């Protein structure tokens, strides 16, 4: 039985120590400790990858707020919304398999751009995942629920 893609990767980001800025990438390498070259690598493997949906950005835009991609702190931005998947659900992207480990909470730093953002994104910021199979993710890779 062949699997069908549910979406694709739109943007990839890493973060660096000493700054909250996100750096756009063309490819991410992941292992069991998280995203290589990311400041959160090997910090908390249960929360080593942050995945967000374009739907979060569209929601904020409906309120007239221009929020730049990467602002949610995501490593992976995709056009599929994984927020309603169960904990333990597995997602294959590129050669990597990740497992949903936690629903993302809202951080107060999101209010820096606009004070309404934390309230608007209460349940729609993203998901944390842990890496189950190391590999690479590139822009436009397909997303599969496995």
Outline where the language-model segments fall.
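Electropositive, beta-rich accessory/interaction domains or terminal extensions
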Residues: 1-104, 136, 146
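Short, solvent-exposed secondary-structure boundary/capping segments
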Residues: 21-24, 108-114
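Short, basic/aromatic beta-hairpin or loop at an interaction surface
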Residues: 63-75, 111-126
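Well-ordered alpha/beta subsegment
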Residues: 126-146
């Amino acid at each position: 039985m062949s699997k069908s893609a549910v979406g694709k990767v739109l943007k990839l980001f890493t973060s660096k120590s000493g700054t909250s800025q996100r750096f756009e990438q063309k490819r991410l390498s992941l292992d069991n400790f998280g995203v290589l070259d990311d400041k959160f690598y090997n910090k908390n493997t249960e929360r080593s990858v942050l995945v967000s949906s374009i739907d979060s950005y569209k929601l904020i835009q409906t309120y007239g707020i221009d929020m730049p991609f990467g602002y949610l702190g995501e490593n992976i931005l995709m056009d599929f919304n994984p927020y309603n998947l169960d904990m333990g659900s597995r997602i294959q992207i590129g050669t990597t398999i990740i497992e949903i480990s936690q629903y993302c909470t809202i951080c107060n730093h999101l209010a820096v751009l606009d004070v309404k953002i934390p309230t608007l994104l209460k349940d729609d910021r993203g998901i944390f995942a842990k890496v189950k199979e190391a590999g690479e993710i590139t822009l436009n890779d397909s997303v599969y629920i496995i």
